[in-house]
Amino acid sequence: MRLSTAQLIAIAYYMLSIGATVPQVDGQGETEEALIQKRSYDYYQEPCDDYPQQQQQQEPCDYPQQQQQEEPCDYPQQQPQEPCDYPQQPQEPCDYPQQPQEPCDYPQQPQEPCDNPPQPDVPCDNPPQPDVPCDNPPQPDIPCDNPPQPDIPCDNPPQPDQPDDNPPIPNIPTDWIPNIPTDWIPDIPEKPTTPATTPNIPATTTTSESSSSSSSSSSTTPKTSASTTPESSVPATTPNTSVPTTSSESTTPATSPESSVPVTSGSSILTTTSESSSAPATTPNTSVPTTTTEAKSSSTPLTTTTEHDTTVVTVTSCSNSVCTESEVTTGVIVITSKDTIYTTYCPLTETTPVSTAPATETPTGTVSTSTEQSTTVITVTSCSESSCTESEVTTGVVVVTSEETVYTTFCPLTENTPGTDSTPEASIPPMETIPAGSEPSMPAGETSPAVPKPEVPATESAPVPEMTPAGSQPSMPAGETSPAVPKSDVSATESAPAPEMTPAGTETKPAAPKSSAPATEPSPVAPGTESAPAGPGASSSPKSSVLASETSPIAPGAETAPAGSSGAITIPESSAVVSTTEGAIPTTLESVPLMQPSANYSSVAPISTFEGAGNNMRLTFGAAIIGIAAFLI
């Protein structure tokens, strides 16, 4: 006997309805019976006999009408209809593509000036009028659709020649540019004058000439030349000597920006002429020679302090209702130079060889240039047809400072003296360029002390100790420490040499000054290190307040001696670099819970507890029926 699929489904549904009538757990039978009656009240009506007819017919019927008909039907109507309204909304942005069509009207506006090209055709009889559009070559590029139009003004060959006369137009504001800085240029070299103190000292004549070129299309190149020509005359009794002539010429090329405005700056010419005559007196009839040694030194300190000005010229060009502005910046070039010549004459007689040491000359003149430089950044904005372009131009000031010192020593020897033949020696130190804000240059042979900087940037080593000549430093006990000097603005990662520790069991004694190498002074010790001087035969125990876990900057040169020291020691000159760190590194531990209790905790039992064993039994019967049906098929 084979059952059809419809019969199997009917049997399965019937068995499910029978299996669902098992008494429910936890008093949830009413809910299950209501669901069963809703599904199978046509087949099985026995449970409906126990209840009144109002409950069987009205109540169960109310649920299917509300849930199956009204509620489910409302959702498909609301939900599909509402999304149907949304496709209408994307149609609204379709109105926006119509708005970009409005900017399409703007390209028609630039086409309006394209209608004007026939207008310049009318004044073509007047050659000066088409000259204005000829200054703007990019404008004929816009009406490229009309190639014959630019050919019309091209019929007049003298027209492009006329705009060539216009370059002097931007030169109009340049009439006052050279006049501003040239008012104070002649005053600078007139200040340094050298009074004549002794007839032997040559008189120094300083002549300053300043010239300001007129405005022209080409730039003027300033030239600065300083020439010194010493002249000396020696009598016949003195061997002939020659003095070299030193001429220094420095030429500074002109810096002309790429514009139609030339840069014009004044130039100053400094000429120094020294004339000297030395006549040594000799006694020919006596056996004792007389030697006259004259040394002349001239020092002319030259200090130039100038407040530089920068001029910005704005050139505006307008054509066809479009204006273009361009800015040109002019600067000032200052050149400071100094020439110093030292000449020493050492004539010797022919009869007795005399050894004379050349005089030691120490230049006293210094050249110091203090300039407050400023850099100007100019932003040039060019606008054309609703589009602007910005470009930045940086201008500065060029300052050149040079110093030239010439040392010449003449020491001729007689013919009777054998051996050493000395030739004139001339040492010319190189040109020094002193930037703005730097220290004045020191003459050769001197060691300038290191000046401590007020602000030390990060990762900077300790300042260099001061150097003194050999044997000039007084002896100082090894255990003695100079007073501490606090540093200002030292960064956290500054590295400083560690103090020098003497070995145990030794006694500190005063250190003898060295003769071959310059001594190094002890530098100041930072606060936090104490050292006591060690007396002879007494034990000294310095205490250090620096903990093992704390590091503090220590200046170079600090020396400490442990207790119980005896015997002489040699202080080493090497120092180790220790990287220190100021301040403690904070450590914060924060505990974060892994799981946080839910704020929406509910005391209502889950739905699975209400379904109870009825659902489980129904699933069991259903599985059994499906298995039987599959077996029969």
Curated annotation (Swiss-Prot):
| One GO term describing the cellular component | extracellular region
Task: Indicate the principal place this protein occupies in or around the cell.
Answer: secreted
Low complexity bias: where? 42-114, 172-183, 193-306, 507-549
Annotated segments matching region Disordered: 40-306, 411-569
**Keyword Repeat carried by entry:** yes
Instruction: Give the bilayer topology.
Output: Lipid-anchor; GPI-anchor
Propeptide residues per the UniProt entry: 613-633
Positions annotated with a glycan in the UniProt record: N240, N285, N600
> Pfam family of this protein, just one?
Flocculin_t3
Q: Does the keyword Thylakoid apply?
A: no
Residue ranges with Polar residues bias:
414-425
User: In what way is this protein post-translationally modified?
Assistant: The GPI-anchor is attached to the protein in the endoplasmic reticulum and serves to target the protein to the cell surface. There, the glucosamine-inositol phospholipid moiety is cleaved off and the GPI-modified mannoprotein is covalently attached via its lipidless GPI glycan remnant to the 1,6-beta-glucan of the outer cell wall layer.
What residue spans carry the region label 14 X 10 AA tandem repeats of [EVIQ]-P-[CDT]-D-[YNW]-P-[PQ]-[QI]-[QP]-[QDN]?
46-187
Q: Which UniProt keywords apply?
A: Cell adhesion, Cell wall, Glycoprotein, GPI-anchor, Lipoprotein, Membrane, Repeat, Secreted, Signal
- UniProt sequence repeat ranges: 46-58, 59-69, 70-81, 82-91, 92-101, 102-111, 112-121, 122-131, 132-141, 142-151, 152-161, 162-171, 172-179, 180-187
Per the UniProt entry, the signal peptide is: 1-27
Q: Where are stretches of biased composition, namely Pro residues?
A: 115-171
Localisation per UniProt entry: Secreted, Cell wall; Membrane
GO BP annotations of the record are: cell adhesion
Concerning InterPro entries, the annotation shows: Flocculin_t3_rpt
The lipid of kind GPI-anchor amidated glycine is covalently joined to G612
Q: What else is known?
A: As a major cell surface protein expressed during infection, HWP1 detection can be used for diagnosis of invasive candidiasis. HWP1 epitopes can also be used to develop vaccines for protection against candidiasis.
Q: Which family does it belong to?
A: Belongs to the HWP1 family.
In UniProt terms, what function does this protein have? Major hyphal cell wall protein which plays a role of adhesin and is required for mating, normal hyphal development, cell-to-cell adhesive functions necessary for biofilm integrity, attachment to host, and virulence. Promotes interactions with host and bacterial molecules, thus leading to effective colonization within polymicrobial communities.
Q: What is this protein called?
A: Hyphal wall protein 1
User: From what organism does this protein derive?
Assistant: Candida albicans (strain WO-1)
